Amino acid sequence: MTQENQNPPPEQEDVAADPQVNEAAASEPAAVKTPEQEIADLNQQIGELQDNFLRAKAEGENIRRRAVEDIAKAHKFAIESFAEHLVPVTDSLYAALSTDAGDAKAFKEGLEITLKQLLSAFEKGRMTEINPAVGDKFDPHHHQAIASVPSEQDPNTVVSVLQRGYTVADRVLRPALVTVSAPK
């Protein structure tokens, strides 16, 4: 035998000595999947994705439903807070009606106290009066002109207030009814 036959070429030695190459070669047949296996794997992935989709869809619907319920509760109980502030006013009015006092001055004082209670309840409910002063410029967003009368004041200014208006949280509930000065 010659020396060439006894010693393998250096390329063959490297391949035989490298265990990673041997493992890769051994695992290659296992990595190759049959079409049936690939179809089964893809069907499993489809099932998982459909399940995830349905769960996400159900979660979104639950969030939407809870949001609708929360809004309904907020509307329902928002008025409850305002109503709680009105109860003492009602109590005061019933107390005033039940007295037989003939004293007009005492009755007027009781009404003034009740009005203060009512205005306090309005304030707590973020409800404010629109009560323009005579001479204020007419504001169509907060005032409603009922009549226009000749006046010494500038045109389109408030001459008198017939009925106060109200806002709730900066939104006009009812405009103030006013008489304005006519253009000259």
Swiss-Prot record:
One GO term (biological process): protein folding
Residues in coiled coil: none
Region (Disordered) residue spans: 1-35
Chief subcellular location: cytoplasm
MF annotations from Gene Ontology: adenyl-nucleotide exchange factor activity; protein homodimerization activity; protein-folding chaperone binding; unfolded protein binding
GO CC list: cytosol
Localization terms from the record: Cytoplasm
Pfam families per UniProt: GrpE
Biological role: Participates actively in the response to hyperosmotic and heat shock by preventing the aggregation of stress-denatured proteins, in association with DnaK and GrpE. It is the nucleotide exchange factor for DnaK and may function as a thermosensor. Unfolded proteins bind initially to DnaJ; upon interaction with the DnaJ-bound protein, DnaK hydrolyzes its bound ATP, resulting in the formation of a stable complex. GrpE releases ADP from DnaK; ATP binding to DnaK triggers the release of the substrate protein, thus completing the reaction cycle.
HAMAP family: GrpE
Assembly and oligomerization: Homodimer.
Record-stated family: Belongs to the GrpE family.
Name by which UniProt lists this protein: Protein GrpE
Species of the source: Polynucleobacter asymbioticus (strain DSM 18221 / CIP 109841 / QLW-P1DMWA-1) (Polynucleobacter necessarius subsp. asymbioticus)
Phylogenetic lineage: Bacteria, Pseudomonadati, Pseudomonadota, Betaproteobacteria, Burkholderiales
Encoding gene (name): grpE
